[in-house]
Amino acid sequence: MPATPASEMAPSVSLSFANNFWGKEDAGVDPLLERMHNAKITSDELKSFYTQRAAIEEEYSRKLLNLARKPLGSSEAGTLRMSMDVVRGELESMGKSHQHIAQQMKGELEEPLSTFSGGIKERRKIIQNGIEKLLKTKTQQTHTVNKARDRYEQDCLKIKGYLAQGHMVMGQEERKNKAKLEKTQIQMSATSSEYEQAVKVLEETTARWNREWKAACDKFQDLEEERLDFTKSSLWSFANISSTVCVSDDASCEKIRLSLEDCDVEKDIASFIKDSGTGQEIPDPPKYINFCRGDINDNASDVSDDANYSVAQFQRTMNPA
């Protein structure tokens, strides 16, 4: 089968607003205007989402910073105290990081979206107001054409009726019928002119509407493409910002883990014994003294058993658990 010449192929129609929103009774207007309205709803919802997400970060950062100021291991010592100090310090860093994220979400997401949406809204209103005004005029003129056509059609039907009746009446009735015919013919001339003029006016308005609606479709598509690109980029930035704080939190947690690797249980026990130990001497219990027998000098002011003690040399008993 021979190939079909390119010149004989049906022209391709681009998938655009301007080629797909027409139809009887301007059927394409409502879906397209609804799309533009829904686009505004999406932008408003996204702005609210960013606002609330930033507020969550602010609240979380505030709670982290408050927690970081509270004592942690204030009575502790040694390497565990050092690790706890790192925990508090990194908690403060995490709080500041989340605080910065909240500011980023406001400055890099919420505010640019608000500015962009405001600009889109103004441009859409200008296009939509012009279209709605022209569509109202076109609708009114269509109504005028329909009414003029109905009047003209009724006059034509009356004339046909009078002409048909003229062959069936005579005398006085014939004269009356002729008078009505002449009157209706004069009236028909006027209604015909009105109808013709209304059609001409509507034809001009329709041509103008077709031009302006096509231009509006192109502009609406421009707005939609800009909005979709902007929203995609904005959400991409949101994901990047959100992942940044995850990386920051993980870095702080890694510092905590590293400090815990330096936490030495035996070293802390030895340090506590060295700093606070009270000695190995276990005093013997006091012995009975017979004062009547004179086991002690009567002039002694007290009784001392300092020299009587044993040295602690116990074996450590481990917890079986």
Report each predicted region and the residues it spans.
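Long, amphipathic, heptad-repeat alpha-helical coiled-coil stalk/linker regions
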Residues: 165-167, 173-184
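Detector for methionine-enriched segments
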Residues: 1, 9, 36, 82-84, ...
